[in-house]
């Protein structure tokens, strides 16, 4: 899953889900089906097949991290700042991350790095390696 085509599907300010927008795809909820072809722009309010309204919008970085599928424990946004300060990490850093895990920290590091910076991330788990590749990170 990458941020490029990911949206939040929200009902009643309670039920939030991440979904990947693809033509001719549907998002199935307990309140009906949402057809992605019906979404013309973002943000948008769309009606499910059972006449329930959903808000569809591009997620904030924090929403993406908190709603993304997890394998291992994620590093929460509130902890990322402490890691950046302790590691003296800035946009010009070259980073070697040992233990990609869910990719939450990797994703944030990728977001802040300058184009000339490099981010190397290693994980012994093939599943975590595939998860990082799906995030479409540009510095890896």
Please give the residue ranges for each predicted region.
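Conserved SAM-binding loop of SAM-dependent methyltransferases across substrates and taxa
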Residues: 102-114
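Conserved SAM-binding loop
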Residues: 132-133
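Conserved class I S-adenosyl-L-methionine
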Residues: 92-101
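Conserved alpha-helix/loop element of class I SAM-dependent methyltransferases that forms part
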Residues: 77-91
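Conserved SAM-binding loop and adjacent beta-strand
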Residues: 67-80
